[in-house]
């Protein structure tokens, strides 16, 4: 049920999603939805939280491991974002980006969850970059947190470019360029 609601929000955004549309997508009556979630906002917040949790868990799985494989994991992760974005032919984009852009200004719960997610993703990237530095794949004098913020911006940018219609080659070029400019020892 939550997956169907997430798909509806991903396709049409918060403002473009009605309770009738959610009821249709989930097969539940509007009364049941209001009873369970208090309304569209409550349901969106739950779906958004679960999406953010899954994004962080995926990044952690992608980037956790021994130091000698850290750069390979990082490269695979960056390239995977480009591949997944290119595969999104409907150009729905990322619910984290969509929800943040649409609601963070007016919904403090969404704003806080978005910031927490970005902070967690940044920390996961920082940890992997530090492993790359320990192993000798990246310059140990470089600021690992600054590199993590840069890569986080690149990853979010790849998703935005894909949503905007940039082709697969452009997305892969961004990913490869980001990896190429990381400071080597």
Annotated model-derived regions:
Residues 1-6, 22, 47-51, 55, ...:
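Generic hydrophobic, amphipathic alpha-helix propensity
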Residues 29-36, 41-49, 129, 151-152, ...:
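A generic structured-segment signal
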Residues 4-42, 46:
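Helix-turn-helix
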Residues 73, 87-109:
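Amphipathic alpha-helical segments used for helix-helix packing
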Residues 46, 60-92, 144-151:
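Hydrophobic alpha-helical connector segments
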Residues 76-84, 119-134, 154, 164-185:
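C-terminal peripheral helix-coil segments that are non-catalytic and often amphipathic
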Residues 92-97, 140-161, 173-181:
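Hydrophobic alpha-helical segments that form the core
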Residues 56, 68, 72-76, 108-134, ...:
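Amphipathic alpha-helical packing segments from all-alpha helical-bundle domains
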């Amino acid at each position: 049920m939550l997956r169907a609601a997430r798909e509806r929000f991903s396709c049409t955004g918060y403002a473009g999603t009605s309770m009738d549309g959610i009821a249709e997508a989930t097969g539940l009556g509007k009364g049941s939805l209001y009873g369970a979630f208090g309304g569209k906002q409550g349901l969106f917040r739950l779906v958004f939280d679960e999406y953010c949790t899954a994004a962080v868990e995926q990044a952690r799985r992608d980037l956790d491991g021994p130091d000698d494989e850290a750069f390979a994991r990082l490269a695979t992760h960056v390239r995977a974002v480009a591949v997944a974005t290119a595969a999104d032919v409907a150009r729905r984009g990322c619910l984290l980006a969509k929800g943040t852009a649409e609601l963070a200004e007016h919904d403090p719960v969404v704003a806080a969850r978005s910031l927490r997610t970005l902070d967690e993703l940044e920390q996961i990237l920082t940890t992997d970059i530090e492993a790359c530095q320990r192993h000798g794949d990246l310059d140990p004098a470089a600021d690992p947190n600054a590199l993590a913020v840069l890569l986080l911006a690149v990853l979010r940018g790849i998703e935005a470019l894909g949503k905007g219609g940039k082709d697969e080659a452009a997305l892969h070029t961004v990913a490869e360029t980001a990896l190429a400019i990381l400071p080597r020892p």
